[in-house]
Amino acid sequence: MKIKRLDKSIVSRIAAGEVITGVYSVVKELIENSIDAGADRIVVELINGGKSEIKVQDNGEGMEKDDLLVCYESHTTSKIDSFQDIYTLNSFGFRGEALYSICQISKTTIFSKTASSNLGHEIEVVAGHLVYEKPVQIEKGTTVIVRDLFFNVPARRKFLKSNAVEARMAVEVFERFCLSHPHINLILTKDQQVVYNLPATTLVQRIKALFPDIPMDSLKAIQSQWKDMELHGCAVSPANLRRKKAIFTFVNGRFVVNQLLQSAIYSAYADFLHQKEHPVVIVNLFLPPKDIDVNVHPQKIEVKFSRDEEVFRFVRDSIKSQLKIPIIHHISRNTPAKVQKRQVEYKSPNAKFTTTSEEMLIPPEDFKIIGIVRKRYIIVETEDELFIVDFHAAHERLIYNKMLSSLNQNDGTDLLIPVQIELRESELALIEKNNVLKQIGFDYEIIKNQLIVKKIPTWLDQSDVKRFIIDSIDEIKLIDIYGLEEVMKKIIADISCKSALRTRDRLDLSQAKYLVREIFANKISTCPHGRPVMYSINFKELDSFFERI
């Protein structure tokens, strides 16, 4: 087969697919252009999840006719003149790829007008080709309307998600800009319904609008400077850690994914974090553009620092200093005793699980509880072996088995007074799209920005409903990757861990005997997360070690 040179139009569409991967990336690129244009009001409109139409309107400086007629062409930009400029700019877009890429794979209409012009101008570009240009009477600023995304790349359009999923990802991108630019009036509508209308305000007020479940009095402002670096943002106090992850990192106003920054944040809270607990942190790191490489990823969401160690120490120490974190090692688990007691009393579940050793199936009465050591381990003696049982892991697996076997039985508890939970638009859309909570035993309805919970599973205490729902959202986001069944198991595993007896909880010998009997009867060897439940020592091995045989 002979090697051929690809047609220019094919090359353009392939390249565009690297920059634009879905509705969310169009929204991201167009909002960035609006911010670069100095806009203090940006309106985003989505129709059918953005697959039919995406509209971004701003009141920025606008473009003259000559600029408008070249803005959709390859590598056209007003921000750099030489290659070295890409390492010294603070603007978001700069490579001249975004608008060009969008126009290559859609039907795009652009309106723009500067303050000094009497008239604005309108152009339409279809698959990268200019269809028309004409003068129009409009206000200062730019409006970009993107229709039929990937209409000319059917293979890529086929892989767009459902309307709900595409919209949810776009809303998440929009929310990041709301956090990084609270001084801008940002408005979002979906199918002509207003989702957000956020006036220019402070970061704390933005957080309040986007995260109604976070206690405002737990947020501490962060403002720190060292050498040529600055850190601004908010972080939650160590007493208000939660199971749902909410960490947003920005560099020079740009949302980024960077393991170094994540590690620095978690390091600041290291003395307080228990398993599956996270801080709420929104930080914006400012440093000279020459010390950052944003060209690691086509969408510029990954960055590299030339001063890794300095950045890590600065971010970590700034958070610790501003929060005035004391050196203590205790934080409330918030696990209701009522839930723990109820879970101890249930009968043996039907579900069976394999184990690493078939010999663990021991007659229920053929063991003896020697005692409980370090408020953590049950010591069990049988005729041939000594077992050390982690009672938290064992109890966790028993709860998991029961909950798994009760799925789809619709035996929940109706609430006399429904629980109202305020959630973000993207979170409500996620819950509405998926059926996980209803399969677990919930019944609810969505009214405006609230989830109204009317029925809960029998194993959940009403005081824990809000916490459970919020904790489950991050797992539900993974359905498209892992599938409904796996995500349901993950949620149930997390509930089991939370509800199970913990180290240092009081456990009498009768409860210990019950747990051990259930472990042997159900051939349990690991907790739902894969940790071992018990460790065994053969008496012959002990005798050999002590040279008694």
From Swiss-Prot:
Transmembrane segments: none annotated. SMART domains: DNA_mis_repair, MutL_C. InterPro entries: DNA_mismatch_repair_CS, DNA_mismatch_repair_MutL, DNA_mismatch_S5_2-like, HATPase_C_sf, MutL/Mlh/PMS, MutL/Mlh/Pms-like, MutL_C, MutL_C_dimsub. SUPFAM superfamilies: ATPase domain of HSP90 chaperone/DNA topoisomerase II/histidine kinase (SSF55874), DNA mismatch repair protein MutL (SSF118116), Ribosomal protein S5 domain 2-like (SSF54211). GO terms for cellular component: mismatch repair complex. Keywords: DNA damage, DNA repair. One of its GO terms (biological process) is mismatch repair. It comes from the Bacteria. GO terms for molecular function: ATP binding; ATP hydrolysis activity; ATP-dependent DNA damage sensor activity; mismatched DNA binding. Belongs to the DNA mismatch repair MutL/HexB family. This protein is involved in the repair of mismatches in DNA. It is required for dam-dependent methyl-directed DNA mismatch repair. May act as a 'molecular matchmaker', a protein that promotes the formation of a stable complex between two or more DNA-binding proteins in an ATP-dependent manner without itself being part of a final effector complex. This is DNA mismatch repair protein MutL. The gene is mutL.
